[in-house]
Amino acid sequence: MLKIKNLHAVVDGKEILKGINMEVKAGEVHAIMGPNGAGKSTLSAVLTGRDKFEVTEGEVEFNGKNLLELPAEDRAREGIFLSFQYPVEIPGVSTVNFLKTAVNEIRKYRGQPPYPAGDFLKMIRQKMELVGIDSKLLNRSLNEGFSGGEKKRNEIFQMAVLEPKLAILDETDSGLDIDALRTVANGVNKLKTPENATIVITHYQRLLDYIVPDVVHVLYDGRIVKTAGKELVAELEKHGYDWIKEEVRGV
């Protein structure tokens, strides 16, 4: 599904990504962990097409297409979804209208007609029930006045409605209490299918207690320096990142 080869990226003239290699297959959950400043959020920004970052070398292929040639909006239409660390507020635009526009943009891109109003509302209700979101949030302006937990739940609801092929959760556990964390994780787990994939970017273990990864990568100084199974999460929780840094410096 996603193939990253020797990816280098700079921001404001400083190289942040220094040769990322990674492959994500359909049906898999990958966790990317690492200390602050390692390049985790830069990687998610590059994959989703943020203008701030310049790719200087490497390739990114998504379902056979050159992802780096696509503008950000077409990457979303192709099925890439980003859950932000700090979701933005959009005053005056209700959640339900935002989602209707987004869904119909994707359908138009794929040569499909707009969703009939009745079918759309039926689908919305099914997704609300699936991820356990309060119906009151639908008619409120997108994220405006939402608590941190409500914003994150709303993003998982958006993910349920948009049905992305690849979901990137960038520090989605930031600022969540344990109940909100569990709710978000349960929603993500319910949306997992053999046809889609998820990348979970996090600094801490606790989210990965609920979303169990198939593959764990450690990102350090702009490179993936270690890849293993879920057992690596417990090792990092026990020993921190210092042993990884020492291992890298010793090479």
Language-model segments: residues:
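Q-loop/switch helix immediately C-terminal to the Walker
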Residues: 82-86, 92-108, 120-123
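The feature captures the beta-strand-to-loop junction immediately N-terminal to the Walker
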Residues: 33-35
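ABC ATPase C-loop
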Residues: 159-160
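Conserved beta-strand-loop-alpha-helix hinge in the C-terminal portion
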Residues: 219, 223-245
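Conserved structural motif at the start of ABC-family nucleotide-binding domains
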Residues: 2-4, 17-19
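Walker B catalytic motif
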Residues: 168-172, 179
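ABC ATPase NBD Q-loop/coupling interface
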Residues: 59-75, 143
